[in-house]
Amino acid sequence: MTELVHTRAELAAARDGLTGTVGVVMTMGALHSGHETLLRAARERADHVLVTIFVNPLQFGPDEDFNRYPRTLDVDLEICRRAGVAVVFAPVVTELYPEGKPRVWVAPGQLGEELEGQSRPGFFHGVLTVVLKLLHVTRPDLAFFGEKDYQQLTLVRRMVGDLDVPVEIVGVPTVREPDGLALSSRNRYLSPDERAAALSLSGALRAGAAAAAVGADAGAVLAAAHAAFESGPSGARLDYLVLTDSDLEPGPTAGPARMLVAAWVGTTRLIDNMSVQLAPYS
């Protein structure tokens, strides 16, 4: 049976009752099939799964969708129950931030100011701060994050390593609709026409990956992705489309690489990414 707790004291008591390994899945709610994949991965690796549901105000800018972000706790709880989750921690904002905002934040470093960090200033300060707080209060052995938010996953791994947080970070592959659209809680904002336009993101990534698969160099891979985005369904406005190495460093030439894209579709901002394998120069 899934136990729902709302305070840190209730969480501590519930956590103390879990023997064996504990895996945490941190969410903002509005759970979908992608989250269910995270829950299954956690069940496979850990004796118990703990889920956090918290719409973190620190990671929303003044013009972003904090108030509009979907909140579906009853539905989320049913998904967690079906998945065999042991504990769900769903605090109110003042439970984690009694003074409204923390006095100390986690600085993400240079990578946190690029890509999503450049388009959304302060975003990763808020993300890493809440992740670190939740790691402290949930005390997991493993923490599961989707590769869909690849920059976030990379920064969380760096934070855990640099700050000696005793937890294993596990990345879980992106879940997609049959037509390629990456699952996201924000997809529910899209109209039918916008839903079609959103395929420009995955279409660009697939074109780049296809070019890499036949031996194209980094420049040609990126050019193929840009061409596919521009020729794809109309209605998506590109923010960035880049090719990095697997650690998000610029200038990959061979081996594992990562292509990342962000675009506006109507009033909704979507992100996606895909791994590509660059052939060595002959």
Curated annotation (Swiss-Prot):
InterPro entries found in the cross-reference section:
Pantoate_ligase, Pantoate_ligase_C, Rossmann-like_a/b/a_fold
Tell me the Pfam families matching this sequence: Pantoate_ligase
Q: Which residues form the active site?
A: H35
Single GO term (MF): pantoate-beta-alanine ligase activity
Residue positions annotated to bind (R)-pantoate are Q59, Q152
A cellular component term from Gene Ontology for this protein is: cytosol
Q: Is DNA repair one of the keywords UniProt gives this record?
A: no
Instruction: Cite the binding residues for ATP.
Output: 28-35, 146-149, 175, 183-186
Write out the annotated subcellular location.
Cytoplasm
* Metabolic or biological pathway: Cofactor biosynthesis; (R)-pantothenate biosynthesis; (R)-pantothenate from (R)-pantoate and beta-alanine: step 1/1
The superkingdom listed in its UniProt entry is: Bacteria
Q: Which GO terms describe its biological process?
A: pantothenate biosynthetic process
The note filed under miscellaneous reads: The reaction proceeds by a bi uni uni bi ping pong mechanism.
PANTHER family to which the protein is assigned, alphabetical: CYTIDYLATE KINASE/PANTOATE-BETA-ALANINE LIGASE, PANTOATE--BETA-ALANINE LIGASE
Q: How does it assemble?
A: Homodimer.
Protein's recorded name: Pantothenate synthetase
Q: Which source organism?
A: Salinispora arenicola (strain CNS-205)
